[in-house]
Amino acid sequence: PEEFALFRDKIFPIVMQWEGGGKLHNVAGDSGGWTIWGIAFNYWKSLFKDFNDFKDTTMEEASYIAFVKFYLAIRADAMPYETKLYYFDMAYNMGTSRAIKIMQQCAGVKDDGVIGMITLSKMKNIKEECLKSKRESFYNRLSESKTTLKKFLKGWLNRSKSIYDFKY
């Protein structure tokens, strides 16, 4: 309950500033398709009865989904307090597997995308600066290899910096 309260009251609202809030939107070129509260219908259809159910998602419902499917899935609860926001935002923006692999690179363990006992034991030593550096390098490489995504690069980098600079 304490970890969820931190997430719901502090972390999730900050990230929502970069996700269009509760406005239903569909950005051309974004593979997620229709999105509300940062939840992409194309990726999370199974959580909803239909599109109407999806488009009526409240912020509270979205925070539960994000907490379980992202925050807990990446074990943000095991991260140092000052890195929880940045690490969660990485996962919410680039996917859980990519975020975990970047975190593992910063931890100096095999970046296989699986959080086992070795990774878990190293997570308390993760530095936010390392996450930021590797995240931004990933965005730059991605926009170079997939030119259709280049239009998102400036926004991704602005988001990374803003979340990094934010202190709660």
Model-found features: residue ranges?
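Cell-wall polysaccharide-cleaving catalytic domain and substrate-binding groove, primarily
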Residues: 1-168
